[in-house]
Amino acid sequence: MFALPGYDAFLGFLLIAAAVPALALITNKFLAPKSRAGERQLTYESGMEPIGGAWIQFNIRYYMFALVFVIFDVETVFLYPWAVAFHRLGVLAFIEALIFITILLVALAYAWRKGALEWS
């Protein structure tokens, strides 16, 4: 079926993972009410009448903090497989990982110096 026989289960998982949301969206398209006016355009707030407008401005600190979090979260995603296969990869992979970590530490120092981690 697949060129890499060890990955048949993974391919099946990917197909199911793509089919379930697609099936949910298609089912919603056929079963949902067709009304486009009135209550459908209102903001839903826990079954209560909405209080105030739906558009509010967030402080930029939330975005900066989230951006720094995403950067270091992605770092963890990249470093975990490297740590698992550390003994097989050799010295070159170790040097590459050190360069990667150094770049991220420079980015952390820059964010710290610019005050992106300050909350006050």
UniProtKB/Swiss-Prot annotation:
Gene Ontology CC entries for this record: NADH dehydrogenase complex; plasma membrane-derived thylakoid membrane
Membrane topology: Multi-pass membrane protein
Primary site of residence: membrane
Gene Ontology process terms (BP): photosynthesis, light reaction
InterPro entries xref list: NAD(P)H_OxRDtase_bac/plastid (IPR023043), NADH_UbQ/plastoQ_OxRdtase_su3 (IPR000440), NDAH_ubi_oxred_su3_sf (IPR038430)
Substrates-to-products reaction catalysed: a plastoquinone + NADH + (n+1) H(+)(in) = a plastoquinol + NAD(+) + n H(+)(out); a plastoquinone + NADPH + (n+1) H(+)(in) = a plastoquinol + NADP(+) + n H(+)(out)
Domain of life: Bacteria
Keyword match Aminoacyl-tRNA synthetase: no
Spans traversing the lipid bilayer: 6-26, 64-84, 89-109
Stretch forming the signal peptide: none
UniProt KW keywords: Membrane, NAD, NADP, Plastoquinone, Quinone, Thylakoid, Translocase, Transmembrane, Transmembrane helix, Transport
This enzyme's EC code(s): 7.1.1.-
Any GO molecular function: NADH dehydrogenase (ubiquinone) activity
Keyword Translocase: yes
Subcellular location field: Cellular thylakoid membrane
HAMAP family in UniProt: NDH1_NuoA (MF_01394)
Functional summary from the UniProt entry: NDH-1 shuttles electrons from an unknown electron donor, via FMN and iron-sulfur (Fe-S) centers, to quinones in the respiratory and/or the photosynthetic chain. The immediate electron acceptor for the enzyme in this species is believed to be plastoquinone. Couples the redox reaction to proton translocation, and thus conserves the redox energy in a proton gradient. Cyanobacterial NDH-1 also plays a role in inorganic carbon-concentration.
Membership in a protein family: Belongs to the complex I subunit 3 family.
Assembly description: NDH-1 can be composed of about 15 different subunits; different subcomplexes with different compositions have been identified which probably have different functions.
Protein name per its UniProtKB record: NAD(P)H-quinone oxidoreductase subunit 3
Species the sequence originates in: Parasynechococcus marenigrum (strain WH8102)
